[in-house]
């Protein structure tokens, strides 16, 4: 069963590396993380794009620019998994979440 993680992202550079590590270790090769970027004025977008280049499970998409709820809705619309987890941009996942 394919798992999708939907993330609404806005200036989360301070947390993104640790967060992705805690998420990706729990996902299989067929799973995905959809990151809807509503803004990254903290300079973190290049880091996100590099992470997506290095791990094909990460997909970075343009956010709608209309707040966190619309940004989550955008991420969810792009998910293709049977199970969808939501992740705020500063979540650190416990090892047994998935």
Predicted regions, residues:
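Active-site acidic Asp-centered loop
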Residues: 38, 87-89
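Short aromatic/hydrophobic "clamp" motif used to bind/position activated sugar donors
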Residues: 84
């Amino acid at each position: 069963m394919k798992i999708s993680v939907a993330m609404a992202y806005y200036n989360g550079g301070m947390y993104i590396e640790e967060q992705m590590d805690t998420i990706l270790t729990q996902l299989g090769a067929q799973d995905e993380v959809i990151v809807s970027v509503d803004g990254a004025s903290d300079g973190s977008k290049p880091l996100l794009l590099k992470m997506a280049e290095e791990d094909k499970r990460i997909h970075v998409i343009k956010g709608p620019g209309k707040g966190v709820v619309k940004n989550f809705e955008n991420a969810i619309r792009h998910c293709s998994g049977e199970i969808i987890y939501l992740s705020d941009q500063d979540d650190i996942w416990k090892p047994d979440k998935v």
